[in-house]
Amino acid sequence: MWGHDLAGVDLSITRPSAVAILSGGIKILRVEYGELATRLSKMEVVAVDAPLTLPKGGAFRDFEREILRRGFRLLPLNIKSMRELALRGSELRKALEQEGVIVLETHPTTVRRILGLSRKDLVQLMVRMGYHGERLLSPDDVDALTCLLISILYVEGKVEIVRGEEGSMVLPLPGSIP
Protein backbone atom coordinates (compact mmCIF):
# COMPACT_ATOMS: atom_id res chain seq x y z
CA MET A 1 0.00 0.00 0.00
CA TRP A 2 2.76 2.46 0.91
CA GLY A 3 5.63 0.76 -0.91
CA HIS A 4 7.71 0.64 2.26
CA ASP A 5 8.57 -2.08 4.76
CA LEU A 6 7.66 -0.57 8.12
CA ALA A 7 7.17 -1.86 11.65
CA GLY A 8 5.94 -0.95 15.10
CA VAL A 9 7.17 -2.69 18.25
CA ASP A 10 5.71 -2.82 21.75
CA LEU A 11 8.94 -3.91 23.43
CA SER A 12 8.67 -6.20 26.44
CA ILE A 13 11.22 -7.31 29.02
CA THR A 14 9.24 -10.29 30.34
CA ARG A 15 7.55 -11.90 27.33
CA PRO A 16 7.66 -11.90 23.52
CA SER A 17 7.18 -8.41 22.09
CA ALA A 18 4.18 -7.49 19.96
CA VAL A 19 5.34 -6.48 16.48
CA ALA A 20 3.13 -4.96 13.77
CA ILE A 21 4.61 -5.17 10.28
CA LEU A 22 3.56 -3.45 7.06
CA SER A 23 5.07 -5.37 4.16
CA GLY A 24 2.45 -5.88 1.48
CA GLY A 25 -0.25 -6.09 4.17
CA ILE A 26 -0.35 -5.51 7.91
CA LYS A 27 0.29 -8.39 10.28
CA ILE A 28 0.97 -8.78 13.99
CA LEU A 29 3.59 -11.15 15.35
CA ARG A 30 4.96 -12.11 18.75
CA VAL A 31 8.75 -12.12 18.70
CA GLU A 32 11.24 -13.14 21.38
CA TYR A 33 13.74 -10.42 22.25
CA GLY A 34 16.71 -12.38 20.89
CA GLU A 35 15.05 -12.57 17.46
CA LEU A 36 13.84 -8.97 17.15
CA ALA A 37 16.88 -7.45 15.45
CA THR A 38 17.01 -10.26 12.89
CA ARG A 39 13.26 -10.12 12.18
CA LEU A 40 13.32 -6.32 11.78
CA SER A 41 16.67 -5.87 10.00
CA LYS A 42 15.09 -5.49 6.54
CA MET A 43 12.58 -2.82 7.59
CA GLU A 44 13.07 0.77 6.47
CA VAL A 45 11.55 2.34 9.59
CA VAL A 46 10.76 0.82 12.98
CA ALA A 47 8.91 2.79 15.68
CA VAL A 48 9.33 1.43 19.20
CA ASP A 49 7.27 1.85 22.36
CA ALA A 50 10.23 1.90 24.73
CA PRO A 51 12.91 4.34 25.79
CA LEU A 52 15.81 4.09 23.34
CA THR A 53 18.27 6.09 25.47
CA LEU A 54 18.94 6.55 29.18
CA PRO A 55 18.76 9.88 31.00
CA LYS A 56 22.03 11.54 31.98
CA GLY A 57 20.55 12.03 35.42
CA GLY A 58 17.15 12.09 37.05
CA ALA A 59 13.92 10.38 36.16
CA PHE A 60 13.18 12.02 32.79
CA ARG A 61 15.23 12.86 29.72
CA ASP A 62 15.27 16.46 28.49
CA PHE A 63 12.84 15.92 25.60
CA GLU A 64 10.46 14.01 27.90
CA ARG A 65 10.24 17.06 30.15
CA GLU A 66 8.92 19.01 27.14
CA ILE A 67 6.29 16.32 26.51
CA LEU A 68 5.31 16.40 30.19
CA ARG A 69 4.97 20.21 29.98
CA ARG A 70 2.41 19.66 27.22
CA GLY A 71 0.25 17.68 29.64
CA PHE A 72 1.07 14.13 28.57
CA ARG A 73 2.02 11.40 31.04
CA LEU A 74 5.16 9.29 30.84
CA LEU A 75 6.71 6.78 33.21
CA PRO A 76 9.97 7.87 34.86
CA LEU A 77 13.15 6.02 33.96
CA ASN A 78 14.23 5.67 37.59
CA ILE A 79 11.76 2.78 37.96
CA LYS A 80 13.74 -0.48 37.71
CA SER A 81 11.52 -2.04 35.03
CA MET A 82 11.66 1.12 32.90
CA ARG A 83 15.44 1.23 33.19
CA GLU A 84 15.61 -2.41 32.05
CA LEU A 85 13.28 -1.58 29.16
CA ALA A 86 15.50 1.37 28.22
CA LEU A 87 18.57 -0.89 28.16
CA ARG A 88 16.80 -3.33 25.84
CA GLY A 89 15.50 -0.49 23.71
CA SER A 90 18.98 0.98 23.39
CA GLU A 91 20.42 -2.41 22.38
CA LEU A 92 17.69 -2.93 19.78
CA ARG A 93 18.16 0.60 18.38
CA LYS A 94 21.92 0.09 17.98
CA ALA A 95 21.49 -3.32 16.31
CA LEU A 96 18.90 -2.03 13.85
CA GLU A 97 20.77 1.18 13.06
CA GLN A 98 23.83 -0.93 12.17
CA GLU A 99 21.61 -2.55 9.52
CA GLY A 100 20.57 0.86 8.17
CA VAL A 101 17.10 0.85 9.75
CA ILE A 102 15.64 4.17 10.92
CA VAL A 103 14.55 3.61 14.54
CA LEU A 104 12.05 5.94 16.20
CA GLU A 105 11.00 6.18 19.83
CA THR A 106 7.32 6.88 20.39
CA HIS A 107 4.65 6.58 23.07
CA PRO A 108 1.36 4.99 21.91
CA THR A 109 -0.88 6.50 24.59
CA THR A 110 0.36 9.99 23.73
CA VAL A 111 0.00 9.26 20.00
CA ARG A 112 -3.64 8.22 20.42
CA ARG A 113 -4.37 11.26 22.61
CA ILE A 114 -2.93 13.64 20.02
CA LEU A 115 -4.99 11.98 17.27
CA GLY A 116 -8.14 11.74 19.42
CA LEU A 117 -8.33 7.97 18.96
CA SER A 118 -9.40 5.32 21.43
CA ARG A 119 -7.77 1.88 21.21
CA LYS A 120 -10.88 0.68 19.35
CA ASP A 121 -10.70 3.63 16.92
CA LEU A 122 -7.03 2.86 16.26
CA VAL A 123 -7.81 -0.77 15.41
CA GLN A 124 -10.63 0.33 13.08
CA LEU A 125 -8.23 2.74 11.36
CA MET A 126 -5.67 -0.03 10.87
CA VAL A 127 -8.37 -2.35 9.46
CA ARG A 128 -9.18 0.37 6.89
CA MET A 129 -5.44 0.53 6.14
CA GLY A 130 -5.14 -3.21 5.50
CA TYR A 131 -5.01 -5.09 8.82
CA HIS A 132 -7.09 -8.28 8.71
CA GLY A 133 -6.31 -10.01 11.97
CA GLU A 134 -8.22 -13.08 12.98
CA ARG A 135 -7.72 -12.95 16.73
CA LEU A 136 -8.71 -10.64 19.54
CA LEU A 137 -6.05 -7.97 19.95
CA SER A 138 -4.30 -7.47 23.27
CA PRO A 139 -3.33 -4.00 24.53
CA ASP A 140 0.26 -4.84 23.47
CA ASP A 141 -0.95 -5.58 19.92
CA VAL A 142 -2.79 -2.25 19.78
CA ASP A 143 0.33 -0.45 20.99
CA ALA A 144 2.37 -2.19 18.27
CA LEU A 145 -0.20 -1.07 15.66
CA THR A 146 0.01 2.47 17.07
CA CYS A 147 3.80 2.36 16.67
CA LEU A 148 3.34 1.12 13.09
CA LEU A 149 1.08 4.11 12.45
CA ILE A 150 3.94 6.37 13.59
CA SER A 151 6.28 4.67 11.10
CA ILE A 152 3.71 5.32 8.35
CA LEU A 153 3.23 8.95 9.37
CA TYR A 154 7.01 9.42 9.56
CA VAL A 155 7.40 8.28 5.94
CA GLU A 156 4.57 10.64 4.97
CA GLY A 157 6.21 13.57 6.80
CA LYS A 158 3.26 13.98 9.19
CA VAL A 159 5.15 13.84 12.48
CA GLU A 160 6.77 16.13 14.99
CA ILE A 161 10.12 15.08 16.41
CA VAL A 162 10.56 16.35 19.96
CA ARG A 163 14.36 16.47 20.27
CA GLY A 164 16.80 16.89 23.10
CA GLU A 165 20.40 16.12 23.96
CA GLU A 166 19.26 12.80 25.46
CA GLY A 167 17.30 11.53 22.47
CA SER A 168 13.99 12.22 20.76
CA MET A 169 10.40 11.11 20.55
CA VAL A 170 8.31 11.01 17.40
CA LEU A 171 4.69 12.12 17.71
CA PRO A 172 1.97 12.65 15.10
CA LEU A 173 0.95 16.07 13.94
CA PRO A 174 -2.62 16.74 15.08
CA GLY A 175 -5.13 15.70 12.41
CA SER A 176 -2.59 13.62 10.50
CA ILE A 177 -4.62 10.40 10.29
CA PRO A 178 -4.04 8.82 6.86
How should these model regions be labeled?
Residues 1-178:
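Phosphate- and other anionic-substrate recognition elements at nucleic-acid/protein interfaces
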